[in-house]
């Protein structure tokens, strides 16, 4: 989660997306509904946050990690984006399913509101 914060706050969506499972079966649920696939998810991020100013400063809080087994965790918490007054701040909550893959720990399911 700290890697994601750092990548986001450096304006690097590509690095931010490295924690997501690069697969068509990735599920991302957000304000626009359910999206499937890593390609669709990164495209949506890049369309929504075209500049570093729009990205703002990301902070994750109240992170709770619940193990399902040795290779699966459910992570919940609050996210916030601090941005300048002309754009406005954003915040919400998330639930992530992290699964240990051959390439390391990856987010396979993201429900962000």
Residue spans for each PLM region:
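Hydrophobic/aromatic beta-strand elements that line small-molecule binding cavities or substrate pockets
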Residues: 45-46, 61-66, 79-81, 93-99
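Short, cysteine-centered beta-strand-loop-beta hairpins and adjacent loop/turn segments enriched
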Residues: 53, 81-89
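Short, aromatic-enriched amphipathic alpha-helices that serve as compact interaction elements
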Residues: 1-12
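Solvent-exposed loop/turn segments at secondary-structure junctions
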Residues: 33-35, 81-82, 113
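A short hydrophobic beta-strand element
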Residues: 71-79
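Short beta-strand edge/turn micro-motifs at domain boundaries
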Residues: 91-113
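A solvent-exposed, acidic/Ser-Thr-rich amphipathic alpha-helical stretch
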Residues: 13-67
């Amino acid at each position: 989660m700290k890697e994601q914060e750092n990548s986001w706050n450096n304006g690097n969506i590509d690095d931010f997306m490295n924690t997501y499972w690069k697969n068509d079966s990735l599920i991302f649920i957000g304000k626009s509904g359910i999206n499937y696939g890593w390609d669709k998810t990164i495209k949506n991020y890049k369309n929504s946050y075209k500049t570093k100013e729009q990205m703002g400063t990301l902070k994750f809080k109240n992170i709770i990690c619940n193990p399902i087994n040795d290779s699966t965790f459910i992570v919940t918490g609050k996210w916030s984006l601090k941005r300048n007054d002309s754009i406005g701040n954003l915040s919400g909550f998330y639930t992530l399913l992290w699964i240990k893959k051959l390439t390391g720990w990856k987010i396979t399911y993201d429900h962000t509101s």
